[in-house]
A protein has these predicted regions:
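General N-terminal targeting signals
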Residues: 27, 44, 50, 84-86
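Core segments of small alpha/beta cavity-forming domains
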Residues: 1-39
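Exposed beta-sheet edge and beta->alpha loop/turn motif
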Residues: 56-99
């Protein structure tokens, strides 16, 4: 699942910035990739996925899924989007559920 791959790649605070972004980029929507390029991985407060994903869907928008993961910094959410039915899922955002 794309959300699982993305959260594992995201939560690597010791990874050099360029490598971190290059490995994460294929899973990101273009708009989110612009923002993610400026994230400093050293500031990401988790490096372990403890459980998940717990998926939440929107009955009004089947091309939107939230995947929640428990990490060693609490719950984090990966927002997944699909352009159209059958298209690949891409990450539209990753963030702490506490924010």
């Amino acid at each position: 699942m794309v959300a699982t791959k993305a959260i594992k790649l995201f939560g690597r605070p010791d990874e050099p910035e360029r490598r971190w972004f290059a490995e994460l980029r294929p899973y990101l929507e273009k708009e989110y990739a612009v923002d993610a390029e400026y994230i400093d991985p050293a500031r990401i407060p988790f490096d372990k996925i403890l459980s998940g994903p717990k998926l939440e869907t929107d009955s009004h928008n089947p091309q939107l899924v939230l995947a929640r993961f428990k990490t060693n910094d609490g719950t984090w959410t990966v927002e997944m989007h699909q352009d159209r039915h059958g298209a690949e899922w891409l990450v539209g955002g990753i963030g702490s559920a506490a924010n």
